Amino acid sequence: MAQRIFTLIFLLWTAVGTPQVAASSFGQKLFGNSTTSRFLPVDGAFAFEFQQQGNQLNLRWDIHPDYYLYRAQIKIEGNGATLGKVELPQGESHNDEFFGQVFILRDRLALAVPIEQAESGATVKVTYQGCADAGFCYPPETRTVPLSQVLATANTDSPINTLSGQTAPPQTTPMPFSPWWALLIGIGVAFTPCVLPMYPLIASLVLGRKEQLTPRRTLLLSMTYVQGMALTYTLLGLIVAAAGLRFQAALQHPYILIGLSVMFIALALSMFGLYTLQLPSSVQTRLTEWSNRQQGGSVTGVFCMGALAGLICSPCTTAPLSAILLYIAQSGNMLAGGGTLYLYALGMGLPLILVTLFGNKLLPRSGPWMQYVKEAFGFIILALPVFLLERILGEAWGIRLWSALGIAFFGWALMLTLSSKKGWMRGVQLLLLAGVVISAKPLQDWVFPPTGTAQTHTSALNFAPVANIADLNSALAKSPQPVMLDLYADWCVACKEFEKYTFSDPAVQNHLSRITLLQADVTANREEQNALLKKLQVLGLPTIVFFDTQGKEIPGSRVTGFMNAEQFQAHLQKFSP
């Protein structure tokens, strides 16, 4: 009797439970297992760790094989903290059909973030994004890292490794150019029309005496004059860098960077002759009188003359000097600030040393070429706002700005050579023309994108937009047909491949004509979009979700990763009416 009761219970359970299980199993077999399992969750693909060691924050990603991070999408921002410069590895070049040449990072990524100052409760926001080689891309991932308090002291440039007890090398903010470039800039400024003709006069004032001096004495006096001038410039560099270090956090603000860029552009325009920048004439006259009172020929007098000469800025030196000072202030690097200005002054003084030793015969003849040197420095100064604006506008716009600057410089140089009759100049003109063409390539690709490059999101299908969970629920409730929800983002390469190769296929479009089409664009990564992705349990893109007429997701029908037109059509035939 008991055995019969047990058999009856078993048959009832089978009758009730088996259809559901069977239906689910049938759906799995019919549509194939959900392809979500093909891809790892974001924490499995990019395992992220962090550790603060004194005033250094160490970030680490363990990147799973066949996955990669986009170098340009790694962003680190401090909240209540001032962070130093973070150097990212170059990565490997990756040619993408839709985004062009990009750099990606594989295997492992370790970054050391200098913390110059951190308030109590400060945090660091770390954003990163990556994809799988199979074409599956993850939304931008943001992690908030808490920081321990770090006081802004003179020792904050030397992070202490609390694990080993060893002091790491000082962390400084690197400048875009080596300070040694300042030496070449100083030499170049010496050959501008406001400076070069003055060297014979300055040489006579430095030597002072009419009797013949020994070469050693002449070299000593000229070097003393240059060192006096260099001292003034070095002190200016140290003062400005110290001020910049104190207000470095404010100087990183976008509005400040834009203001500095405008000032650099104004300084560059003065080098092109649009207007003149110099000290007020009354101040220059007084400084000149003080300089003339010094006794030429004596070491002390010549040193004072050089120190005062460093304050007398001619129209040709004001703009380059101001540009260097502004950039030093923005970098906040005292060592580089003082050294850069010293080398700049030394470069300006080298022609003077040669004139005092060998006379005027070593100086080139004056001519229009000196004005060309001055204008060339205008282009050099224009490079500085590009460096600053690139931080705000991003890498893509930075390349376009460099492109525009390259076109302007090579075009200007080409125009200067057109009047030359010399045969060898034709080769120079060809090189300059090639420079114009190469520089124009990024702008050309932006204005006239190559075939296959999508500048705006356009679809071959007529999707109804869905912005959030409420929109999706409303659309599902109203639709008398099955529903296909396409989750799209501009940063998703495979999403663009779906648009170009799959949704444009006539057979696919014919099947989809009997289905309500919805699309959620999650490019902006807003909170409501993230909530939608979380509700649908979407790991990454592309993801396409199918719902039945009751608004329920059809088991096993979800698509993750790219499918070509033939594969997608076969998938649709399994459940489309």
UniProtKB/Swiss-Prot annotation:
GO terms for cellular component: plasma membrane. PROSITE patterns: THIOREDOXIN_1, THIOREDOXIN_2. It catalyses: [protein]-dithiol + NAD(+) = [protein]-disulfide + NADH + H(+); [protein]-dithiol + NADP(+) = [protein]-disulfide + NADPH + H(+). CDD domains: DsbDgamma. Its main location: membrane. It is found in: Cell inner membrane. One of its GO terms (molecular function) is protein-disulfide reductase [NAD(P)H] activity. It holds the Pfam family DsbD_N. Keywords: Cell inner membrane, Cell membrane, Cytochrome c-type biogenesis, Disulfide bond, Electron transport, Membrane, NAD, Oxidoreductase, Redox-active center, Signal, Transmembrane, Transmembrane helix, Transport. Residues 1-23 form the signal peptide. Belongs to the thioredoxin family. DsbD subfamily. HAMAP family: DbsD. This is Thiol:disulfide interchange protein DsbD. It comes from Pectobacterium atrosepticum (strain SCRI 1043 / ATCC BAA-672). The lineage of its organism: Bacteria, Pseudomonadati, Pseudomonadota, Gammaproteobacteria, Enterobacterales.
